[in-house]
Amino acid sequence: MGQIKTRCSTAAGLFLILLTVIAGFSSCKSNQKDIIPSAEYAPYVNAYTGGVISQNSTIRIELTQDQPMVDLNQELKDNPFSFSPSLKGKTYWVSNNTIEFVPEEGALKPGAFYEGTFHLGDFVDVDKKLEEFNFSFRVQERNFSIHTDPITVTATQPDQVTVTGEIRFSDVVKKEEVEKMLTAGSEKNKSYPIEITQTDHPTRYAFSISQITKEAEDYQLEITAKGNPAGIDHTQNESILIPAKNSFRFLSAVRIDQPENGIEIIFSDPVSNTQDLKGLIDVPEVSSSIFQIKENKVFVYFETGKLNKLTLNIHEGIRNSQDKPLGTSHSISFSELNLKPQVEMATSAAILPDS
């Protein structure tokens, strides 16, 4: 269901709407104005669907008073809703005071603005001028972004790389559409299969590209997402460095806060889990730290307190799973304790009372 607008404590503030854009994927058109119902409807209408809604939403009207008798979940023969542009669908009572219009699949168009009319006078005794309740809503325009994780290299297959990530949408998209969007290949035009998995979040899909072979030299894996199969006019490209085989080196380090606060260090090869990392990796600004090795990644966990600067020192003596030393020391400074960016792609709306 879409955003439901609720009645404020004062009639004058009945349907004042604030659209809060959490990320840059809202597509409200400035030449189409939202319909703000009059406060005169306050005694009769408690809530309605409005603002920015999902393409899979239903449209609801919640009355302030229960109807004496309704046939729940049975389609109404006479549809009390009308829309511009026109929408096909069915109408049901879902409770004694809430009526719902269910659009046909695919009827709501991404980015479209709709004006709705609910024939309030069919259910409540009102003045003639209030017999029709007019409202509006917009359908979330589709967009997406790709987020890739650091590469994974295992001790059992040190010459193979796995790339994982997530593709995040502004609205619900079918898995078969996502599968047609993503491709991956190298400069040698080799194509790699991509496994797509639905996550617990309805607008996010995980992807995995495995058995990417290391070559004699570094090369770039190109991941391309074309939105056309999902009706999205957007393309995104991501380049992932695939390190050369037999080349153990430090790749990158990022601040993390999950599962605990710390730093994630990524190497080109799996790190030996038989060595003591104390003295080989240290953060001078913290009094104590805990190390965890996961294949080619080392996690350093610690409490930061009120620190505004961190230094990560990586000693050249660190060895990979084949006992080859790193050979070069590194010192990385984190001047600001910024974590990995958390990107949200949703639009929400809320009702504000009169000031």
Q: Which role does the model predict for each range below?
A:
Residues 9, 20, 46-47:
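Compositionally biased, low-complexity repeat tracts
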Residues 2-15:
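Bacterial N-terminal signal peptides that target proteins for export
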Residues 7, 23, 32-33:
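N-terminal type II signal-anchor transmembrane helix
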Residues 13-24:
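Bacterial N-terminal signal peptides
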